[in-house]
Amino acid sequence: MDLREITDFNAPELDVYARLTENQLVNRADPDNALFIAESPLVIGRALDAGCVPVSFLMERKHVEGKAQGLLERCPPDIPVYAAPLEVLEQLTGFKLTRGMLCAMRRPKLPSVEEVCAGARRVAVLENVMNPTNIGAIFRSAAALNMDAVLLSSAGSDPLYRRAVRVSMGTVFQIPWTYFPEDAPWPEGGMALLRRLGFKTAAMALRDDSLSIDDPQLLAEQKLAIVLGTEGDGLAAGTIAHCDYTVRIPMAHGVDSLNVAAASAVAFYQLGKD
């Protein structure tokens, strides 16, 4: 273990934790050096399980020989481990750390839509979902409630943003996911790609002609893509028009909509049944 006590907040090797934005970590100009931040021992462990490559750790000093010991034993011995008391770490990062531990990791190469959909029966499609907290919650529900993959439009939030990874409890590393490619952009290109792969599409939207989510037609589909829209406006009208089904969640007490993360959990539970 290459243990390094933090003595200089301005050290360039700490930029990844203290000064680089999420967009800078993505590093689209040099994707081979793109990074993400995993937060908490559980999330870091799940990232390692998925084969993600660690670059460095930042943690409370007390965790080096405590909660982090098993994680560090799984990493090469020359991985830098930056350590300090919790108050110093929070002053450095500018946010409250969950479980006092961060790990900078290489961003994995994303698979193709065809690869993540191979053998899949149920996939979630996220159209322009912008809030990382919602992204993380949707991934957690997708992994728990029988979705086989998650597909995202390019305009949505990144599932590897620190907050999304943390809220997902590391399930972003447990369920296959990717973006629709530039040569098949969402919605028209992505919809055509899903059809070529044998999927029917179900738009989650409140329309007069919507099917109830418990309609037997939906469960009878061998391959179904469940399409969820952005916060506030929901799915674009053009997206709904291109889908095979429009589906609603029945609601009581005059409530007219659910948060996209809550709606996803209901949809995945009902439509993900075997």
Residue ranges and their predicted role:
Residues 108-209:
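RNA substrate-binding interface of SAM-dependent RNA methyltransferases
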Residues 3-10, 80-85, 176-187:
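Short acidic-hydrophobic, aromatic-tinged amphipathic segments that line or gate anion-handling sites
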Residues 66-78, 239:
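Short, aromatic/basic amphipathic alpha-helical patches
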Residues 101-103, 141-145, 156-173, 237-274:
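Structured adenosyl-cofactor binding patch, chiefly the S-adenosyl-L-methionine
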Residues 1-70, 156-157:
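Boundary-proximal intrinsically disordered activation/regulatory segments immediately upstream
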Residues 202-255:
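Active-site/ligand-binding-proximal alpha/beta "capping" segment
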Residues 73-96:
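Glycine/small-residue-rich loop that forms an oxyanion/phosphate-binding "nest" at active or ligand-binding sites
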